[in-house]
Every structure is written in C-alpha cells, then in structure tokens.
Amino acid sequence: MKFHCKPLHVLPFLTLLLLTLASCFGGSNTAMRNGGEVTGQRSSVPLEPTPYGMVEIKRGYLKVGLSENDSLWGLPLSQRDISVDGFWMDQTEVTNSMYRQFVEWVRDSILRERLADPSYGGDESYKIEVDKFGDPVKPHLNWNKPLPWRKPSEDQERALNSVYKTHPYDGTRMLDVKQMNFRYETFDYEKAALRKYRLDPRERVLNTDVNVDPNEVVMISKDTAYVNDNGEIVRETINRPLSSLYDFINTYIVPVYPDTTVWVNDFPNANNSMYMKNYFSSPAYNDYPVVGVTWEQAQAFCAWRTEYLLRGMGPEARYIQRYRLPSEIEWEYAARGREGHTFPWEGAASKNEKGCFYANFKPDRGNYTEDGNLITSRVGQY
C-alpha cells in the first residue's frame, strides 16, 4: 500500500513551522525577555574529566636560577620569576606494562596492514576505505576485527609470523624490534596562527595602508619522514613554498621498542644481563618504570596515547587536552611542590636527622639495598 501526500497540505505546515522557529530564535522576543541587555550566550560545556593516573598541578610561580651567589667565582646570581599555568601530570612514571601496551598496539597495526595486503591474502576487512554508504574515506585500520591468532589460514599465518624472528643461538621466538615503527602526524597550530604564514596575503599585515604583494612566495619548513627501500627511516626537514594547510602537518616515524641494552652499557661489570633480557618483557616487572626510552620515543608515546584516548572518547574528544611531555619549567615546578621552595619539603637539607636522603639524590658509598631495592622500585612506592 502506498501513501501519497499532497504538496498543498505540506506547504502551510512548513510555513507555520518556520514562523514558529523564527519566533523562538528571533531577536525581538529575546531582547524583550532580557530587557534589552546583553547577557551572553548560555551553552553547556562538559567538564573535563580527571585523566587516568594523573594529578592536577595548580597554577603558580617559581624562581628559576641560582638562589645564592657563586662562592668560588663571586658571580652575580641570575634569577627569573616565571608564572606557570595549571596542568595535569602523571602521578608516577610510565610503567613497563603501559609502554608494552604501546608496543603491542604498534605490532597489531602492522599486522592489520599486512593482512589487508594482497601479498598476504588481501583481506580487505582489516582496512576501511569506504563508509557505510560506499563513499571513499581516508583509509584507516579496522580495529573491531580481531587478529586470527587461533586458526589462521596459510596467508594469515605468514602475515602473523612476519613480525617475529628466531634467535640463532637458543631458538627463542621474539619480536623483530626493527619493524616496530610508529608513524604519526602533528598539526603545528602555533605556526599556522602566525601572520607571516597566513594563506591569504591580505592577512599578513595589520596595517591596511601597506600594500601587500599577492604574489609573494612565503617559504615554510616542515618535518617529514619515510622508510626507504632498505627499510631505513629517513628524517628530513624540508623547505617549500606555502600553499595550503597541509604545509603545517609534520610527519614522524619512530622505532618504539626501548633500548634494553642500557642495563649492560650503562652499568659495566654489574652482571645485569638478566635485566636486559627480562626487565621490559617479563610480567614480574609490569609495575616498574620503563627505561631505555629516548625523547623521540616519549614524544611518540604521547601522540599514541592521545590517539588512543580520542578514539575511545567519541564526540567529546574535542574538549580534551592532548598528551605531551612537560616543559622544563613545568617539570621543575611540579618537582619542587611548593612556591619558593628549593625542594618539595621544608628547608634546604637533602637528608633527615638520621642521615637518610629525602629523595633520589645520588647516594654516597654504602649499602644500596638498605631500602629494599637494588635497581628501580615499583612505581608509587615512595
């Protein structure tokens, strides 16, 4: 059975609806309700939730520099008063289990790419290239489809095994860390806001009496990275004429697996080979701080942590601050704990009346195990 609706009956209804909407949103009635006063637009803004595992560092100030003149050379002290806005900071160090989640995510993303590759069977369900209406979208991985660990086909098994290798001496199957590369992009909002980089030449100069050359070529630098035919990461900073917003996008590729050999290289003659083998990979050290991570890897972890959070937040993600490393001033401000204090505790002494250090200063000669630890301890223990 088909239903027909006459246009003649619809038009009066639409007209009435438009008049009603105009009455609701019209300026005259609003002005009458407010007595003609500008009271500001009211809108509900969702409160920013407390980030998991983080604490709020409230705004304040600190003095940066020497607090006393150099007694040897008599150099004048140099101090600066710096105001710091509030920010969130991790309550503890990033643990092995947290960073291992990052490494495994990178591994799984590589596997999904390969499972969708025709060289490994070409399962297109692991990569989304069209939306539900069949229109093309920016290709992205399908994280809703699980990896076929239990009963893989021959092609799938080749893909799953491609990120592992076998130790030539003891036959141990281990992750091929050289393949664990994380690619991410950042948009440089600060550079895009500078007037000299405005896409419209008329916006580059505030003085309207100054003539602006519309054909002026503005050069911009950006970071980019790619993997060459030998599997090596190539990082470049290129300069090119500014042409679009894409010129403010920087691309980075970072090998994310931590350097586990620091246990041997940084502590010679310490017999630390067992920590080199087990500290990062063993569940026994899940709650211990990750070590052997470079600044570039820490930046990549922040980018991944942001991406991971935004994917889980949905539309509310636009109100959430992105993860980043603290600045030098923010770190010092958080470490001091209080305004005007050299240390987070009262006074300028580094030891208490029993001779014990208040914090992790380099200790003197003595019994390093007296506090129950020889290497790093579980996070949050002190």
Predicted regions and their residues:
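Bacterial N-terminal signal peptides that target proteins for export
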Residues: K2-P12
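Coil residues (strongly favoring Ser/Thr
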Residues: S71, S109, P136, S162, ...
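Acidic-aromatic/histidine active-site loop/patch
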Residues: T95
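Conserved hydrophobic ligand-interaction patch in extracellular adhesion modules
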Residues: W88-T92, F102, D108, R114, ...
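Post-signal peptide N-terminal segment of mature Sec-exported envelope proteins
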Residues: M32-R59
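C-terminal motif of bacterial Sec signal peptides marking the signal peptidase cleavage site
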Residues: L21-S23
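Sec-dependent N-terminal signal peptides
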Residues: L11-L19
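Functional-site microenvironments in short loops/helix caps that host divalent-cation chemistry
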Residues: F25-N34, E56-I57, K63, E68, ...
